[in-house]
């Protein structure tokens, strides 16, 4: 319950892979929900599923997103802050023709006169071997891991493992520069 503003209904799940069929089942059964909150810290949800929820005026996110949603006074769709930051940077980049959110972490970027790139955006404080391996297991298809958290770092071991998997790894600032090159 909000201290100030409209009341809202939340549906809570705990899934690592959030399928559109599951979400449609929830939305069809509980027609008055405003947000679906996933307890799992690491999860995957497709861009198609996110778009479906937004078409129904339903927000989706983790527990932090639920807290942010509850501090609003209305039930407007909440876009996760990290993707809002990423999309603004990509929209403003002169080499980016367009981009598509494939899921909650991966973005397919179409560039002018250069090959498309699929990047996974990680907001981890430190990108470790585990970050690389778990991302590869969960998200499978991508060419580069982009560290969007300006704090912390990327371990040398993570760079080695990423290299053996033919995955590049860099910070957000370095990635924006790489978008101008033929690197992939």
Name each model-derived stretch:
Residues 47-94:
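Surface-exposed beta-loop interaction hotspot
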Residues 41-44, 151-153:
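Gly/Ser/Thr-rich loops at beta-strand to alpha-helix junctions
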Residues 71-74, 108-109, 181-182:
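Short, solvent-exposed polar/charged micro-motifs at secondary-structure junctions
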Residues 132-184:
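Alpha-helical oligomerization segments
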Residues 1-29, 35-40, 105-138, 144-145:
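Conserved catalytic cores of phosphodiester-cleaving nucleases, focusing on short active-site segments
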Residues 66-71, 127, 175-180:
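A short acidic, often aromatic-flanked loop/helix-cap motif at beta-alpha or helix-coil junctions
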Residues 26, 45-56, 155-165:
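Short, aromatic/basic amphipathic alpha-helical patches
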Residues 87-111:
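Redox- and metal-dependent alpha/beta enzyme cores, enriched for Fe-S-associated oxidoreductases
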């Amino acid at each position: 319950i909000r201290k100030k503003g409209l009341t809202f209904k939340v549906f809570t799940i705990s899934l690592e892979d959030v399928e559109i069929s599951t979400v449609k089942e929830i939305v069809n059964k509980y027609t008055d929900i405003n947000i679906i909150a996933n307890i799992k810290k690491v999860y995957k949800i497709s861009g198609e599923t996110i778009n479906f929820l937004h078409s129904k005026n339903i927000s989706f996110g983790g527990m932090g997103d639920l807290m942010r949603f509850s501090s609003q006074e209305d039930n407007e769709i909440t876009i996760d802050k990290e993707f809002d930051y990423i999309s603004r940077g990509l929209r403003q980049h002169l080499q980016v023709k367009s981009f598509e959110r494939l899921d909650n972490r991966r973005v397919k970027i179409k560039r002018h006169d250069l090959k498309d790139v699929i990047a996974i955006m990680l907001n981890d404080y430190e990108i470790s071997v585990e970050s690389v391996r778990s991302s590869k297991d969960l998200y499978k298809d991508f060419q580069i891991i982009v560290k969007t958290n300006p704090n912390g770092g990327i371990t040398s071991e993570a760079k080695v493992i990423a290299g053996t998997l033919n995955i590049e790894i860099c910070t957000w600032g370095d990635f924006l520069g790489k978008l101008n090159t033929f690197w992939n």
